[in-house]
């Protein structure tokens, strides 16, 4: 394997960065595989709930698929809580940052804000403001985010629901993450 000559990026040459570009592209092509592997491992999280984190994601994505959402939205729904393990206080933003280069502004916004909107169902039971989402009431994706939470997220904790299998979503994930990125950084 070729390696760069620098120990500080400011001393890198065009040749060095061409070497890295080749490896970066190869790594980027495997993003979907790494995401699917991580999702598959989500079998022991969501303590206190009746289902696993993986099952919650599968239920939510199955509901989106059955509702004939775009493939982009189905994949975003599958990944909407992928940030819970690493960023429990801002999991929505974490998940949104993963999908941002490959999805529309609308899909990004929904996933980015779903955590706050989802608190509508629980905040008032814990001394919080269930209507905190209303600060976005004039935003063009406000209703779409409410619909996302109502139709796919808040109702996907059912141990008796028949979800699609992760392998059924795998080709969709691979197609979305093989798109030419809409955004970079």
What are these regions (language model features)?
Residues 1-78, 82-185:
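Metal-dependent phosphohydrolase cores
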């Amino acid at each position: 394997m070729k390696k760069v000559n620098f120990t500080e990026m400011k001393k890198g040459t065009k040749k060095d960065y061409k070497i890295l570009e080749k490896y970066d592209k190869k790594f980027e092509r495997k993003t979907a595989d790494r995401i699917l592997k991580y999702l598959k491992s989500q079998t022991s999280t969501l303590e206190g709930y009746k289902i696993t984190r993986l099952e919650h994601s599968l239920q939510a994505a199955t509901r989106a698929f059955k509702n004939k959402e775009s493939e982009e939205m189905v994949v975003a729904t599958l990944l909407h809580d992928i940030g819970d393990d690493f960023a429990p206080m801002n999991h929505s933003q974490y998940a949104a940052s993963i999908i941002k280069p490959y999805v529309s502004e609308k899909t990004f916004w929904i996933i980015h804000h779903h955590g706050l909107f989802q608190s509508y169902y629980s905040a008032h039971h814990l001394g919080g403001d269930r209507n905190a989402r209303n600060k976005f009431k004039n935003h063009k994706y406000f209703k779409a985010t409410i619909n996302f939470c109502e139709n796919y997220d808040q109702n996907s904790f059912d141990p008796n629901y028949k979800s699609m299998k992760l392998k059924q979503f795998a080709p969709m994930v691979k197609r979305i993450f093989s798109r030419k990125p809409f955004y970079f950084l």
